[in-house]
Regions:
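Alpha-helical sensor/transducer elements of the RecA-like P-loop NTPase core
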Residues: 1, 51, 82-83, 134-198, ...
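Charged, amphipathic alpha-helical interface modules that flank catalytic cores or transmembrane segments
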Residues: 1-28, 32, 54-55, 211-222
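Post-nucleotide-binding-loop coupling segment downstream of the phosphate-binding loop, primarily
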Residues: 15-20, 24-109
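C-terminal boundary/linker of central alpha/beta nucleotide-binding cores
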Residues: 54, 197-204, 247-323, 330-331
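Conserved P-loop NTPase "ATPase switch" module shared by AAA+ and STAND
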Residues: 104-124
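Loop-to-helix "switch" segment enriched in basic
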Residues: 164, 202-260
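A eukaryote-biased feature capturing mid-to-C-terminal, repeat/solenoid-rich segments of large proteins
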Residues: 206-226, 259-261, 320-345, 350-354
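Extended alpha-helical scaffolding segments used for macromolecular assembly and cargo binding
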Residues: 328-410
């Protein structure tokens, strides 16, 4: 465990307390990792890949000297750079940090297990995968992608009805009384782990009776199947759609208050690793954590032992399409983040999560108020510069370039700032000076 003292924030989150029905898979995983060193645990969203990985770490922790956990954010090179080593110097560049971290990870032997959670890309999309696969430690990836060229363990539904019924009874106290109906509900949602959990929580909250829920799911399933007869499952897409439709039905049975819908809408931008509930409540100016706690009870909002909250990936996708977060709708969140970024002298210890959230906003938000959005980006950039957060700075430059291409968008000062930002990241002094001169020329037009 020496490594955990050296790399902060890299311990494996604990699996949920009610982890059941996967004994065979745990053993298979152990054998595969022993024989192949690197294993990709694949399966559709909500089937329990991340939970199995966490349970594996807990179950076999005596077999390893170190177990490290990294949540994939879309770029392996960046995720390794962003690991928190205790002797990282604040003034070191991203490149230096990356080289030190990579060198250290390369030195680890097979008594270390590295878990890379939510690696949802193809091998060609993340060119750095081939480098990571040269590490000598054991690596367990969880992924929704089909990566057939590697050693994979496909995770299917839990077949044992008793185990699934047990899971439902953890969340639904009257499951025994309505056993027959609950089992039918489990069959109707195709034994999909996350759907079973949501259904049980829905019943526990008294929002509908087991019979009502079963009828509703069956009706939805029948209409879905009629539309879907033509599409024979070619790529697993249609089965994925079926699961989404179940989750969607369960989601729509809740009548969420406007405040709760708003919270969910803003939570779409949180990094998948989650953020402290208190910090998030402060960003949204919520007087209490009550609404968030109610959402945790429904199962839509996930929480870990560290009191961090995030949306389940399936719920995030549904929330995005249902609530359509926009600059106007999420103005309180944007104002709060902008406010933090304007306090240049003030350091926040969660800056990485803050910047990941800003990155997700750029990617997902509807830009329905361009002047406000431009100001938001222009205030975020210098704050990222304080922390040498180049990934985010590049993201802002790309977004500004894209927006300011259109003549009617933005002002001369917006264009001057973009040139100034590009100069900040330019490594060649003569190029940087030229960019600054161009920026000044833009401003002369104004004065």
């Amino acid at each position: 465990p020496i490594v955990l003292d050296y790399i902060m924030d890299s311990e494996v989150p604990k699996p949920c307390r009610h982890f059941i029905g996967r004994d065979k898979e745990l053993e298979e995983l152990y054998t595969m990792l022993e024989e192949n060193r690197h294993v990709f645990l694949c399966g559709i969203a909500g089937i329990g890949k991340s939970e199995l990985a966490k349970a594996y770490a807990k179950h076999y922790k005596k077999h390893y000297t170190n177990i490290l956990y990294v949540e994939y954010t879309g770029n392996l090179h960046q995720d390794i750079t962003d690991m928190d080593f205790i002797d990282d110097l604040p003034e070191s560049t991203e490149q230096e940090r990356f080289q030190r971290h990579n060198r250290f990870l390369r030195s680890l032997k097979s008594d270390t297990l590295l878990i890379i959670d939510n690696f949802n890309v193809t091998a060609t999309q993340d060119s750095f995968l081939s480098v990571v696969l040269k590490y000598r430690c054991q690596i367990l990836f969880t992924t929704r992608s089909k990566l057939d060229e590697y050693c994979t363990l496909p995770l299917k539904e839990i077949e044992n009805m008793n185990a699934l019924f047990q899971l439902a009874s953890v969340f639904y106290s009257e499951a025994d009384t309505y056993r027959a109906t609950v089992e039918k509900i489990i069959e109707t949602v195709h034994s999909h782990t996350f759907a079973v959990e949501l259904a049980a929580k829905l019943l526990e909250n008294g929002i509908s009776t087991p019979d009502q829920l079963l009828t509703r799911l069956q009706v939805e399933k029948a209409s879905f199947h009629n539309e879907d007869k033509i599409k024979i499952i070619k790529d697993g897409q249609s089965s994925k759609a079926t699961y989404y439709s179940h989750i969607h039905t369960l989601f729509s049975l809740y009548t969420l208050s406007l405040e709760q819908q708003d919270i969910m809408c803003n939570m779409c931008f949180l990094p998948s690793t989650g953020i402290s509930a208190r910090i998030f409540a402060k960003w949204l100016e919520l007087p209490t954590l009550n609404e968030i706690n109610d959402l945790i009870e429904t199962g839509f909002v996930q929480t870990t032992t560290r009191r961090t909250i995030s949306l389940h990936p399936m719920i995030q996708e549904i929330t995005l399409s249902e609530t359509k977060p926009s600059v106007t709708r999420c103005h309180i969140l944007l104002d709060s983040l902008q406010h933090i970024c304007l306090m240049h002298g003030m350091e926040v210890d969660y800056y990485k999560k803050l910047f990941q959230t800003i990155g997700n906003i750029i990617e997902l938000i509807e830009k329905d108020d361009i002047p406000k959005y431009l100001l938001f980006l222009e205030n975020a950039f210098p704050y990222m510069d304080n922390y040498n957060y180049h990934k985010g700075m590049n993201g802002i430059i790309q977004e500004l370039k894209c927006l300011l291409k259109t003549k009617s968008i933005g002002t001369d000062s917006d264009r001057a700032l973009l040139l100034d930002f590009q100069a900040t990241l330019e490594t060649k002094p003569e190029k940087a000076i030229k960019l600054e001169k161009d920026a000044l020329a833009q401003i002369e037009n104004i004065t």
